[in-house]
Amino acid sequence: MSSGNRQAPMPPPKPRNLGRGQFYQQGGYLTPQDSDTDSGISADCDQGSPRAAAGFGGTGFNGTVNGQQVNSQRRIPDLPPGAYQNYRSHSSADYLTPNSARKIASYSTTPRRLPLQPQQQAPATATKAKYRVRFADEVDSGASTSSGTSSTHISPRNDPQEMLMNSAVGAPQITSTFQQPASYMQNSSDAQYKMNKIEYPPVSRTPPVACSSRTGTLQRTPNRRLPISSTPQPQPTYADQMQSLPEPPPYTIAMQRLRSVEQQPQESFRDAFIRKSVNDTLQRRYRQRSSSLPRGNKSYYEGIDIYDAQPPIRPLPQQQTSLMTVANQLPGSLDNLHINNLNMRRRKLPTAPLMGSSCQLHLDNSDELTAYRALQFQMMQDELQRQQPPPQSFERPTLLRRTNMPQQQSFNIPHITTTGPPPPAMGLSVPVQYDQGEYGTQSVRAQLVALDQRGFRRVLVEKMMPGPFGFYIATGVVAGQRAGIFISRVSLPSLSPMLTVGDEIIYVDEEYVKGRSLEYVQSVIAGKTSVTITLLPAVGQPAIC
């Protein structure tokens, strides 16, 4: 039985209690119970019920059969040994629960056994030879348990020459175990015999006799021993071995090699400590430099002095020292801020592009800059006047951005974002023109009108083109009762900053709609291009005043 076909251990059978302590026996053994119903273990587990095992107590159980008190011992199924091995294995007698395993094992009549090892009863081949291992210090008996030649594997006792020859020919002695033709085996043995004869001429070798008849088994080349009567060779002594060793090189050669090596300059401990401290300081400054400072070369600052109100006096190139030349190539960081030089003082940032233009202004004073801005603004205003005004399809055109201003107004602020009506013109009236927003034309716009201290919010919702307002309302229910009208959905992104899902509508165009029906609020909002809604935001509750 191999380890791959091992079956799970089967627990000892449990009695089935039919009532009044009577146990039902069938076939000479107790009927097992279902282990997945009377215990808390899953159905795919083969463990017995610890609850049922604990009810027996001791080593047996007492029952009443025909009014007599009997003490019956638990027993395993009476099956033949072969059938018993088929459905239960002795490979394991332990269970998942240690306590239940001890109790169930104590009830069993069979002692606990070790797991059975797989027994391989393969028929031994008749041609297989058994070799006995012999050592050199054993007494030579002249006999062998091998079925082959008697002198094949007998080791010598104290013959160093024979031991040397055996170690020399020990590697090619074992041949392959698969079947080979008889002629091939004979030729290989002859070649081995010739090699041994050439290497060791004074030793006589004989080829094996039954090599062709013992194919397919472990083959060894026979090593003939010298006669026992031969005298062993004397072993070399320790003094002889020491005399045979080569002499070491003289001391003078080693000293000459040491003197020929050039003397390397050695750094003192003080110099090494100073160098390490300086390197650590520089590395720490480099790592801790500000990430907000520019990382370019110092030549980045050369063309920015023209924006200063009073340009500094630049030194001549020949007056610039080598230290400053090196400092200009270093990245801008905290390392070189201690250098005091006119070229490295604080700079003024260049002027930002005006009116959406990408050109850089190279003007020296503020008067020229103001004149340039005025000229650029006048050209833009003339271009807008030549264009046709947009069609007036609504009550009043209200857009996000104004692109023209009266001439008397300051030119320092090119873009003015306003949402209310244009201011009254001073002097000559200029028609107000509007452009589209940055993200295209918006169909609906929401504007915050007022914010109450109690948390209420007034929002003006205006249509920029025909269509719906873009938000939905629904009747809210709080604690099972109607609570009012709430915003249930916002479909336009332009309304999301002012209108939020869950905001309660209190007023619509100064009309109190709290408690009104949903249809009434819809009729109030419908048919209008702009509506003012007073909301109670759902984010926070109004403060108690």
UniProtKB/Swiss-Prot annotation:
InterPro entries documented for this protein: PAR6_homolog, PDZ, PDZ_sf
Bias (Low complexity) ranges: 109-128, 141-152
Polar residues composition-biased segments: 86-100, 212-221, 228-244
Biological process, per Gene Ontology: centrosome cycle
Residues annotated as domain PDZ: 458-540
Domain of life of the native organism: Eukaryota
Entries under PANTHER family matching the protein: PAR-6-RELATED (PTHR14102), PROTEIN CBG16414 (PTHR14102:SF14)
The protein's name in its UniProt record: Uncharacterized protein C09G1.4
